[in-house]
Amino acid sequence: MSRIVLGPQKSAKHFFGPKRAHVLVAAMAAALCVPAVGISSGSGLPTSIGKGEGQLNLIAWEGYTQPQWVKPFQKATGCQVHAKYAGSSDEMVTLMRQGGGSQYDGVSASGDASLRLIYGHDVQPVNPNLIPDWKNFIPALKSPPHNTIKGVHYGLSLQWGPNTLLYNTTKVKPTPSSWASIYSPKFKGKVTVPDNPIQIADAALYLSKAQPSLKITDPYELNSTQFNAAVNLLKQQKPLIKKYWALASDEIDLFKNGDAVIGASWPYQTNTLIAAKVPVKDEIPKEGATGWADTWMMSAHAKHPNCMYKWMAWVSTPKVQAQQAIYFGETPANPKACPIMNKLSPGSAGQYHCGASASYFNSIRFWKTPVAACGNGQNDCMDYTKWQQAWTQLKG
């Protein structure tokens, strides 16, 4: 969302400010969650979208509910949007479970939260056929494994992008080309990274190249030896950290004030800082990058399901996809947004890899929830609970 962002996870304190068990859900339960739509007797999913209920309560990454696309949506649908920004995927999961899960209608979940929400019965299946632009999404994001289980869709893909290395061009020389720079004593007290357990994956990705003897092949599937190596690297980094940032705006302030000169970031921060005349650039280092692929998901107890469906349809359109992509600095799920991006901001489609090849998409190690079952058929990986525990202990 931490994300870049979309993007850390991406503290939730702002509204409309600047800016990633069991699967089965009974069909009747799904029907009850959508009281004002047409229901198919076969799937239990709605077959049409009814009249909006008048409001929509969302949990979102900072920068995902901007007035330029929210205000037209409200005018067109009558659904008044109330958005709460979350600073991490962990926070999103917690917020979605508040008040019995009925406080919010939807969430812009990243891949390290979406499966937790599905398996925790916090979100409900949706009918993607009610979203006209879903058919235009890139193939990899129509039914991706982070939001679609055994053919059942639990949300609509939105945007995706890489986590980047952000640096002040006047203070950091030579130009950094490796994630090693954020672990270097050279920048002691001037480094900032997301306040997010998923940072362990970023450390693991770096170590996969820096220490090949660890044999790390997937930064989210770590045995105890690999996991401890990543955590130890982050412990060594801790004295260098100025602040672990929660909101994107926290990191923006650190760079504006000169309190940080290098760190892990999202393109959103880069765009905002450049607009504010702060001398920064970002890079995808030679080791590669982790990243996010976000999904709008509907609460299992949504009070305004029609407005949520209308919102998912709205943000899937080429124009809104283009607006958000440019604003945040990410890539649309809908490639029909690419020419609109170039009209709004010449060259932006190429800049953010809109319509990029599948090989580029596959080169990003997208967030996913760490589980004990490793890809090697073993059950010896550290699950997300251990990641959370290690991160909490690390920060003290």
Each predicted region: which residue ranges?
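A ligand-binding cleft/hinge motif common to bilobed small-molecule-binding domains
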Residues: 113-116, 264-279
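Conserved C-terminal helix/tail region of periplasmic/extracytoplasmic solute-binding proteins
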Residues: 362-396
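Early extracytoplasmic/lumenal segment of secretory-pathway proteins
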Residues: 43-117
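Short, low-complexity disordered leader/linker segments with a strong preference
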Residues: 1-55
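Mature extracytoplasmic/periplasmic domains
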Residues: 290, 299-365
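Periplasmic-binding protein-like
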Residues: 231-237, 276-300
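Extracytoplasmic ligand-binding site segments that recognize negatively charged/polar headgroups
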Residues: 59, 64-66, 90-91, 103-104, ...
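A bilobed periplasmic-binding-protein/Venus flytrap-type ligand-binding module shared by bacterial periplasmic
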Residues: 164-171, 206-207, 292-304, 323-326
